[in-house]
Amino acid sequence: MKLTTIPNEFKEAAPVIREINAQGFEAYFVGGSVRDALLNKPIHDVDIATSAYPEEIKQIFKRTVDVGIEHGTVLVLMEDQQYEVTTFRTESTYQDFRRPDEVTFVRSLKEDLKRRDFTINALALDSTGEIIDLFDGIEDLTNQTIRAVGNPHERFHEDALRMMRGLRFASQLDFKIEEKTLAAIAEFHPLLEKISVERITIEFVKMLLGVNRQGGLAPFIETECYQYCPKLREQGAGLFRLMDLPARQIETEAEAWTLLIQSLNLPEAEIRSFLKAWKLSNQLIQNVSQLVRGLRFRLSNDWQPMMLYELGEESAVLVERLLYYYQQESQVQVTKELVKALPIHQRHELAITGKDLLAVLEETPGKWLGELIAEIEQHVVEGSLENKQEVLLSFAKKQRSKGEKA
């Protein structure tokens, strides 16, 4: 089979392959880029596999960088582009179920392709657009099937993360996992405990953001892979609730975590530790915590000025978008107007500062100062105090006077 239209990404990288070919070696585009080209999807990373050994590649090209030479990968720099070129290889046993104990360079494309995870990723493409399909990957693409290359038991024992990748592809591509491959995932899912949380998180998030997350979540639950993901062991019912939400694709990672937490009915006090267990960044944890708080408020209330102020426009709009999943009408434009109409949007917009209060009240700093500023801030946001210096200072004097009498 030949590609009728060769994507620009391949055209730009073709000189690398032609140069390797000119020196008597084989070279092909491989992996996800070939799959995505056949599916007419955007191509991200172009990977090249070759029969040339790393030292031979370094002799062919003037500008190279050793980025993973022990695994056969050399970065080739050509004009303003860079391409990863990896030698055909076979791999030995995998003691940690993730990385091979030993890599052996070979001259055979077939030996290289048969160690790959799924047939749809075991495709190669030469510089003329001719596709090399040794494991019926094109047929599986046509039938929208995710099938392990060769024996699925061996593939998942080599690299346990492949199970999560299979579930992710089911969601991303809207494909079905082939029966024997699915059975092997169900059998070997305990091996996921050998995989780092960070790697599991990447695949899990991609699964939630896929075009058919239900198509990934259903086998994720069925095979019990969730039991080896952070803090999900006892959360089967919550995952079913997540799966039952309307099918519209989730747009951002923060929204995905928010919908998951809401489906799990996590108490507010447990949200931070749950997200930390997934090794998320502090910024993302903060954003998601805000979104959950806003969503839970909005599901049973109209917006209140203080809640909008604390969330800010971006988070408030995301909350409105999330209402769709709970059969409530989203009012994005109204929400934007409500936020815009707030008297202030950040504390520094207050007409007074802590220094002003200390000067006028002639007091030393203490806990009282932060509490008083917060009280003033709330009154201004809610419209019960005008944001003018004299008004706010007068209010502050009255409040301190009350405090002294008390």
UniProtKB/Swiss-Prot annotation:
What EC number(s) are associated with this protein in UniProt?
Answer: 2.7.7.72
Report residues binding CTP: 32, 35, 116, 159, 162, 165, 168
Catalytic reaction list: a tRNA precursor + 2 CTP + ATP = a tRNA with a 3' CCA end + 3 diphosphate; a tRNA with a 3' CCA end + 2 CTP + ATP = a tRNA with a 3' CCACCA end + 3 diphosphate
Pfam (any one): PolyA_pol_RNAbd
Q: Does the keyword tRNA processing apply?
A: yes
The regions listed as transmembrane in this protein's record are none
**UniProt enzyme class:** transferase
- SUPFAM superfamilies from the UniProt entry: Nucleotidyltransferase, Poly A polymerase C-terminal region-like
Chain sites annotated for binding Mg(2+): 45, 47
The source's superkingdom equals: Bacteria
The residues listed in the UniProt record as binding ATP, with positions renumbered to this chain, are 32, 35, 116, 159, 162, 165, 168
Among the GO biological process terms of this entry, one is: RNA repair
Miscellaneous notes for this chain?
Answer: A single active site specifically recognizes both ATP and CTP and is responsible for their addition.
Do you know which NCBIfam families this protein is assigned to?
PRK13299.1 (NF009814)
**HAMAP family with a match to the protein in the record:** CCA_bact_type3
What's this chain's function? Catalyzes the addition and repair of the essential 3'-terminal CCA sequence in tRNAs without using a nucleic acid template. Adds these three nucleotides in the order of C, C, and A to the tRNA nucleotide-73, using CTP and ATP as substrates and producing inorganic pyrophosphate. tRNA 3'-terminal CCA addition is required both for tRNA processing and repair. Also involved in tRNA surveillance by mediating tandem CCA addition to generate a CCACCA at the 3' terminus of unstable tRNAs. While stable tRNAs receive only 3'-terminal CCA, unstable tRNAs are marked with CCACCA and rapidly degraded.
Similarity comment: family membership: Belongs to the tRNA nucleotidyltransferase/poly(A) polymerase family. Bacterial CCA-adding enzyme type 3 subfamily.
Name of the protein in its database record: CCA-adding enzyme
Q: What lineage, starting at the top, does this entry show? A: Bacteria, Bacillati, Bacillota, Bacilli, Lactobacillales
